[in-house]
Amino acid sequence: MSIVVSNKQKIHYELAGDKGPWMLLHAPHLIPMSAWKEGGYVKQLEQDFRLVIIEPLGQGLSDAPEDASHYTIKSRIRHILDILREVQADYTFFLGVGLGAQVGFQMSKEFPRRIRSLISVGAQPYQELEEAKYMKEKQEQLRSGNLTAYLQQWHSLDHLSADQEKLILQGNPEAYALGLE
């Protein structure tokens, strides 16, 4: 288990693979880092890359402060830069899904030399009005403490394993809501 302290917050990450360039894997909001292994991504990618699998603030073993200032994209980029410094990676390939892709978009804009290439899934760099409204509704749902109702959206798509759901349900709903801001 690897931890880096970034902006006074503990950020959990794991490493895999021992050859090739660095690739950072950043999952979507609330999806545990174990999803990368369960989905077969780590097994496939570690053949050609040294992987950094980040567990974003508010999730899993990373800290979950109840202060919105810690969950900005700028703060999340700082966490990644601190992890890259810790593993001595000058640059990385970046695979981001959802929230991870949004972080990747902004990081590639602000620190273009740190990202060799960006693979984004489930996100685009421009937030639409309807998307903002949807995110506000999801924040309210999380703040109500009813994580089971919030997770229902993934049940219909068969995106969560029982173990992943259990990990999410053990988390802090307020930190999850802040993570959507």
State where each predicted segment sits.
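Active-site loop/oxyanion-hole signature of alpha/beta-hydrolase fold enzymes
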Residues: 43, 52-93
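Flexible "cap/lid" loop of the alpha/beta hydrolase fold
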Residues: 102-110, 115-145
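Conserved alpha/beta-hydrolase "nucleophile elbow" surrounding the catalytic nucleophile
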Residues: 92, 96-101
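Conserved HGGG/HGGXW glycine-rich cap/lid loop of the alpha/beta-hydrolase fold
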Residues: 8-63
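Structural signature of beta-strand start/N-cap positions in the alpha/beta core
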Residues: 22, 50, 90-93, 114-117
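Conserved alpha/beta-hydrolase catalytic His-Asp/Glu region
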Residues: 129-132, 144-181
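The conserved SAM/SAH-binding core of class I Rossmann-like methyltransferase domains
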Residues: 52-54, 97, 121
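Short acidic-hydrophobic surface loop/beta-edge motif
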Residues: 2-6
